[in-house]
Amino acid sequence: MQDAAPRLTFTLRDEERLMMKIGVFVPIGNNGWLISTHAPQYMPTFELNKAIVQKAEHYHFDFALSMIKLRGFGGKTEFWDHNLESFTLMAGLAAVTSRIQIYATAATLTLPPAIVARMAATIDSISGGRFGVNLVTGWQKPEYEQMGIWPGDDYFSRRYDYLTEYVQVLRDLWGTGKSDFKGDFFTMNDCRVSPQPSVPMKVICAGQSDAGMAFSARYADFNFCFGKGVNTPTAFAPTAARMKQAAEQTGRDVGSYVLFMVIADETDDAARAKWEHYKAGADEEALSWLTEQSQKDTRSGTDTNVRQMADPTSAVNINMGTLVGSYASVARMLDEVASVPGAEGVLLTFDDFLSGIETFGERIQPLMQCRAHLPALTQEVA
């Protein structure tokens, strides 16, 4: 690896096209996204996530998203055995921010759509119209078996049928305040939600299978996908192309937002040393559990998110795309991400969130041509 990689040069028209949104994937579970005994070990708290999101807002991040996880992977690090709840966390964060978009995740097997519709309308009120919902079908069977609500393994092949009905109920209630939807999974009888959201409620998904992308193409405002590999910032391009093609079939504009971990330092060698240190401490017991769970869905094909998460190539950070390098190198790679057709944004994680966001805002983002449109920072963040 070389330090201070050269900047890409774009015409003005390209710069306009390449403006890219940046989000932070907040650590709602312990230890963030590194399954390693050598990584920072910490519990999730409101105060930690408040500091992260306020710092992200200060540095002009566009959005913050929290996942939902109901059972972890165990192992020496007790990975994701300790988690906050997404909607209540994001409601709190909505109250202590003013500009950044806020997204919570609904585990749709656990929450009736009418309840999600009302909770979302409430957080819309708290945030002043800055809230949206990420819908997930659920892939980790033990999360739901422990509560006695796993619908059986046939659900793996019907989960997007379920989600289609779910989102139709949401759209009814948010759009008109009333639903009489009748389907295989849900029956609404003059169901009411009021007040309705102050602005159209954004729905996001993370479909990577054909069925997931078809769903996003029809119902989502944008679709998350995994980055791929280490320092291969455009390797996800075929996934973005599939999403773009699926959206063309529905006549909708559904962009891809790509998940990456940033591990940066003054030099490429220093950043690489961090990455190798994290890999050397991989929690093999927790990783084995993830691999076992990934093999239980035999009906959704080989291109699902969970299968990528468990791939041994970089399972230590669940195989999200990883950008390892100097500040200039990471900036260059993120500009390359922005050049991929269909890529409208990135969702970032960090090995250390508080210092990582500050370093990103101070040292990386100013070098990114796809973020050159941002206003100057005006004050220090607390």
From Swiss-Prot:
Catalytic reaction list: uracil + FMNH2 + NADH + O2 = (Z)-3-ureidoacrylate + FMN + NAD(+) + H2O + H(+); thymine + FMNH2 + NADH + O2 = (Z)-2-methylureidoacrylate + FMN + NAD(+) + H2O + H(+)
EC number(s) per entry: 1.14.99.46
Example GO BP: nitrogen utilization
Any one GO molecular function term: uracil oxygenase activity
Induction: Up-regulated by the nitrogen regulatory protein C (NtrC also called GlnG) and repressed by RutR.
Keywords for the protein's UniProt record, in alphabetical order: Flavoprotein, FMN, Monooxygenase, NADP, Oxidoreductase
Consequence of gene disruption: Cells lacking this gene lose the ability to utilize pyrimidine nucleosides and bases as the sole source of nitrogen at room temperature.
Residues at which FMN binds: I68, K69, N134, E143, R159, Y160, S209
InterPro entries reported for this sequence: Luciferase-like_dom, Luciferase-like_sf, Pyrimidine_monooxygenase_RutA, SsuD_RutA_monooxygenase
Broad EC category: oxidoreductase
Cited CDD domains: Alkanesulfonate_monoxygenase (cd01094)
Stored SUPFAM superfamilies: Bacterial luciferase-like
Its job: The FMN-N(5)-oxide reacts spontaneously with NADH to produce FMN. Requires the flavin reductase RutF to regenerate FMN in vivo. RutF can be substituted by Fre in vitro.
Family that this chain belongs to: Belongs to the NtaA/SnaA/DszA monooxygenase family. RutA subfamily.
Name under which the protein is recorded: Pyrimidine monooxygenase RutA
